[in-house]
Amino acid sequence: MQSTSLNDIIYQKSDAAEIDDNPLIAHLNLPPDNDRQAFIRLGLKPEYDTLDRELPTYLRRIKINRLRHFFAPTHPVHRRALIGISSQLFDGYIPRNPMSAEGQRALYGGKADITIRPTISLIAGHSGMGKSTLLDRVLESAGQQSYQHALFQDQPFPERQILWLRRNVPEHCTVKTLCASFGDYTDRILGLKLYHGIFQDVRGGDRNFYLSEIRKIITTHHVGLLVLDEFQNLSLMGVGAAKVIAFLVNLRDELGIPIVIAGTYKALRLLEGDLSISRRLVEGGYYDLKRPLSADDESFNQLCKIAWKYQWTKERSEISDRIIDALYDVSQGITGIMLSVFASAQLAAIEDGSEKINENTIIETYNLRMTPLHPAVNILKSNSPRLIDKFDEALSNALSPNTG
């Protein structure tokens, strides 16, 4: 069930009263029933036709960029994250039903009797493993970001609902800048200027004020999830990081809203320092996008086989163990690097006139065209825990616009 506009809302029957009688969730896509459903919901296929291989060179070059819009949820953690986070979204909305007395108390500032404890979930993994893309797919699977309700069960319900608020943690993040970011983003979604400047005008660090204003945003617009990406950036803040984390704990406990965090393993180390969050991570879900440690890894094999279907060279080649070994060797299992090499190898084959890719094309493309990535990939090849801890920074440097 997908709505096509703000006003096009279809409330469905699930035969569960806590869902059907709640206007905040009766229209949402239900959590997947099983692993296969989760796989289908998460997958993102680039537009492709085998006849594309006969198109002019300039068009095929353009179409290769479609691999940027590709996601294959081959890792079991991908599916667990979708099932877990979408379930938490529903769990969080159930006690906030605005048609119930309890939900009305929460809406108008009273202390709601929230029996389902809010959770904090973490999606962690190396840079390039697809954390942000997984978040994109999980959120899109739930429904639209914003809905304008009108009537529910023949009762007026002229409410604007924001399903999620998602922000990247800036490198110099404070509670104030984080709240200001959420306020400005809410204005952007609504197309209004309700919260712009509220947080900037506050001097000092009045935690109660910040909580009060964020509470207004969450309750007034029925926000279902708070999502924070690039959470590892807090590691640059020293003592200030603890204040931001403490603020998130307050949000979770006082507002009853699930929070989803994504970041590298630095983010995990930041959160592990708070026992309350560590406990909640176990309850809410820790989704580790572990790097495959060999070309034999089942999820990596499946990923390569699915991606290999998207070839825009004139001559199609079949996937083989040698090709998978080559893709692993040049990427060390990092999804983003593997897809970049695959796309670049196709461009190389088109440019040199061979019009076919194989394991040799992959290795040559990596060696000649992707030298900025070599230091980062060599770190992973070293298998040294001390060096691997520096991989994310090395990859970030390689992808920086100022590189080379």
Question: Where is each model-derived feature located?
Answer:
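The catalytic "switch" region of P-loop NTPases
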Residues: 215-225, 235-237, 245-322
